[in-house]
């Protein structure tokens, strides 16, 4: 009997890359126009004032300003960007 295992016997050894979702800029932080605020699956957080949404639900800033997380109603949240005076 062989004292070493044959080549190619393992069926493991695969792993997918992380998708790097989540909040990229937090409340109170300043942001430039076009910068990503949140990467998400579905509208966990909705776009508010001066925030756009990409086809993959990514939220991004439309203006330079400060990020603010707010309530839309009891269940839903939104993120807005307000210009600094």
UniProtKB/Swiss-Prot annotation:
InterPro entries per record: Ribosomal_bL27 (IPR001684)
Gene3D superfamilies to which the protein is assigned, alphabetical: 2.40.50.100
Domain of life of the organism encoding this protein: Bacteria
Signal peptide start and end residues: none
One Gene Ontology MF term: structural constituent of ribosome
GO CC entries: ribonucleoprotein complex; ribosome
Pfam families hit by this protein: Ribosomal_L27
Region (Disordered): 1-24
Keyword field contains DNA repair: no
Entry keyword set: Ribonucleoprotein, Ribosomal protein
Any GO BP annotation: translation
Family stated for the protein in its record: Belongs to the bacterial ribosomal protein bL27 family.
Stored PANTHER family: LARGE RIBOSOMAL SUBUNIT PROTEIN BL27M, RIBOSOMAL PROTEIN L27
The protein, known as: Large ribosomal subunit protein bL27
Protein's gene: rpmA
């Amino acid at each position: 009997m062989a004292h070493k295992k044959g080549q190619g016997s393992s069926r493991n050894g695969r792993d997918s890359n992380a998708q790097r979702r989540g909040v990229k800029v937090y409340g109170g932080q300043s942001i430039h126009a076009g910068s990503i605020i949140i990467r998400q699956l579905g509208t966990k957080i909705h776009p508010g004032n001066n925030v756009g949404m990409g086809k993959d639900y990514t939220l991004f800033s439309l203006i330079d300003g400060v990020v603010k997380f707010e309530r839309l109603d009891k269940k839903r949240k939104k993120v807005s960007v307000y210009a600094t005076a």
